[in-house]
């Protein structure tokens, strides 16, 4: 009986000892990756890109001894290879985030993307901000200036995102600083958009039209809509009196100047269908479509809610419908 009791006590003591070891546990072996640490390179005012931080490695003790509750594990953060390019994001102002690429060898940074919050900037405000701040950003963040060709990439449009983007393949010395005076934007006209920086040019006129999606080319360029408008006006001038011809020239001039406020090119080729917006008067925006055969049609008429109530807009259209069709179609 005494021997049996001693055996039972030994077995129960062994079970308690193993239970304590299971409850205490042991850290994973050295070198095992247990988690990804996302803020290893965090700097004030900067939003870290997830792809820029490697996984963290657990460096706890071995599994032979029990770990105490007061022990603190050590973490070793792997650094990127020397000379390897790394992306990082800086929030320069509320609603403005810029993605940079650190160049190899510590040679500065390259500007990759500028992101604007759609809740704080429309496309005209974003263009104006970049025109006023591009030199400051280049100096502040040590952005290298390249003389290589800058090629635009296709614009991104995602209805699920509430942000707008400037995308730039490379940084240039000739970043545009001149911005046209845009027409006022109403909430229903704000859509997803992209603006791309062209290569530096020598003439001031080309610099004023660096943002092609935001302003059309000057009348002297090879824009098919401008050529079609001039060709349509020539036979009309030939069959009208001098006074009527003068009115037609004024109308063409008004169209050319007003269309610089905004241009919208459809998904089809420019040689097939072209659309542009004309500001007939403050608060009235007329969208005209030109087909491949040169015929024009009135696409839509939009009124600013700040200047026109619904009844006033209907009255304005009834009074000016014939004039609009004769002037722009």
Curated annotation (Swiss-Prot):
Keywords assigned: Nucleus, Repeat
Keyword Membrane on entry: no
Residue span of region Disordered: 12-37, 151-263
InterPro entries: Brevis_radix_dom, BRX-like
Localization annotation: Nucleus
Family as reported in the entry's similarity comment: Belongs to the BRX family.
Protein name: Protein Brevis radix-like 4
Species per Swiss-Prot/TrEMBL record: Oryza sativa subsp. japonica (Rice)
